[in-house]
UniProtKB/Swiss-Prot annotation:
Disorder association: Noonan syndrome 14: A form of Noonan syndrome, a disease characterized by short stature, facial dysmorphic features such as hypertelorism, a downward eyeslant and low-set posteriorly rotated ears, and a high incidence of congenital heart defects and hypertrophic cardiomyopathy. Other features can include a short neck with webbing or redundancy of skin, deafness, motor delay, variable intellectual deficits, multiple skeletal defects, cryptorchidism, and bleeding diathesis. NS14 inheritance is autosomal recessive.
Regions of compositional bias (Polar residues) in chain numbering: 146-156
Record-given protein name: Sprouty-related, EVH1 domain-containing protein 2
GO molecular function term, any single one: protein serine/threonine kinase inhibitor activity
The encoding gene: SPRED2
Domain of life of the native organism: Eukaryota
Residue intervals of the WH1 domain: 5-122
Quaternary structure (record): Homodimer and heterodimer. Able to interact with SPRED1 to form heterodimers. Interacts with RAS. May interact with ZDHHC13 (via ANK repeats) and ZDHHC17 (via ANK repeats). Interacts with TESK1. Interacts with NF1.
Length: 418
């Protein structure tokens, strides 16, 4: 790297909160980078300096408290990505190792999909804007893979920044030597390429007696999701569309100078069900002047009440929340099966005898024949079952457990976040 890089917020395909970890080969462990602290880590698209229209992807991490860039790693085709556990992932490029400790399994899954999508685009050679992640049905977690922005910035300040030109993706490095300025600071114009189209102006259609409303012809939406904390703000949408929407979106604005406030007069009847009070002087037939309250949204009536799960951070419907819907939720039946069958013996053996240098090992009962230690692992498990015969009960018990999950009798349930 020969210059400071500050990727444009609009260039991120995924951005989450995590602690950047570094590998210490001497002790064989992972330690927080630069003293630790929560960082905003994302996968962003960057342009090659040759100006040939080709793009690459950069994993960029910036610590929140002091804006220090603690991680910069270019995504390459030979990147080896490992999911050690639901909240800790690490990868290796050119004998350099990087790790992230996420705040939730949902953030970890989102970041994993972002890295895999970047690698697929590099392999296919298609890293244009059409290949960024906008297909919610393909990727899941529909509140993550969209245009991301920093949650600390003012959402009312809309700005357009061109794509930043940085060095070619030839190395990965932890940044240690400088602190970035404020997000809204201007940058020298000679380091940028103007490749974003100007927003298309709206067509103004005025009517004298209608309220102001916006009719959106293109139903595709862009939701801002910047990380773990934004689930509190996810349902909040702006009244007007973002001017930075792509040029394919068409809008028609119906506006007028002043929106009138409607008052409704209802005659008061003693036998009615309004129950809004009586005339202070006791006279009947008084007029009640009120503004009718808005009913619940049509979506809430049709789909039921939706909340975010405290375990997996996914949205769920309270009416459809049954056992087996949340894989990250604690399940007493699954825990009991592992304790009764003494599976901790198998885990201990695999950890000490068949784990990789990172301490990761394959699931004891995995049937993946591509594993180079497939036969050795099963022979060791069979030998261990003679010392702990109760391990033989694990497979039939797990089969019964899966049947119970299919019947919604077992498994974890979503729990609404407070």
């Amino acid at each position: 790297m020969t210059e400071e890089t500050h990727p444009d917020d609009d260039s991120y395909i995924v951005r989450v909160k995590a602690v950047v970890m570094t590998r210490d080969d001497s002790s064989g462990g992972w330690f927080p980078q630069e003293g630790g602290g929560i960082s905003r880590v994302g996968v962003c698209k960057v342009m090659h300096p040759e100006g040939n229209g080709r793009s690459g992807f950069l994993i960029h991490g910036e610590r929140q408290k002091d804006k220090l860039v603690v991680l910069e790693c270019y995504v390459r085709k030979d990147l080896v990505y490992t999911k050690a556990n639901p909240t800790f992932h690490h990868w290796k490029v050119d004998n350099r190792k990087f790790g992230l400790t996420f705040q939730s399994p949902a953030d970890a899954r989102a970041f994993d999909r972002g890295v895999r999508k970047a690698i697929e685009d590099l392999i296919e050679g298609s890293t244009t804007s059409s290949s960024t992640i906008h297909n919610e049905a393909e990727l899941g977690d529909d509140d993550v893979f969209t245009t991301a922005t920093d949650s600390s910035s003012n959402s009312s300040q809309k700005r357009e920044q061109p794509t930043r030109t940085i060095s070619s993706p030839t190395s990965c490095e932890h940044r240690r030597i400088y602190t970035l300025g404020h997000l809204h600071d201007s940058y020298p114009t000679d380091h940028y390429h103007l490749d974003q189209p100007m927003p298309r102006p709206y067509r103004q259609v005025s009517f004298p007696d209608d309220d102001e409303e916006i009719v959106r012809i293109n139903p595709r939406e862009k939701i801002w999701m910047t990380g773990y904390e934004d689930y509190r703000h996810a349902p909040v949408r702006g009244k007007y569309p973002d001017p930075s929407e792509d040029a394919d979106s068409s809008y028609v604005r119906f506006a007028k100078g002043e929106v009138p406030k409607h008052d409704y007069n209802y005659p008061y009847v003693d036998s009615s069900d309004f129950g809004l009070g009586e005339d202070p002087k006791g006279r009947g037939g008084s007029v009640i002047k009120t503004q009718p309250s808005r009913g619940k949204s049509r979506r809430r009536k049709e789909d039921g009440e939706r909340s975010r799960c405290v375990y997996c951070r996914d949205m769920f419907n309270h009416e459809e929340n049954r056992r087996g819907h949340c894989q990250d939720a604690p399940d007493s039946v699954r825990t009991c099966i592992r304790r009764v069958s003494c599976m901790w013996c198998a885990d201990s053996m695999l950890y000490h005898c068949m784990s990789d240098p990172e301490g990761d090992y394959t699931d004891p009962c995995s049937c993946d024949t591509s594993d180079e230690k497939f036969c050795l692992r099963w022979m060791a498990l069979i030998a261990l079952s003679f010392l702990a015969p109760c391990m033989c009960c694990y497979l039939p018990l797990r089969a019964c457990y899966h049947c119970g999950v299919m019947c919604r009798c077992c498994g974890g349930k979503h729990k609404a976040a407070a």
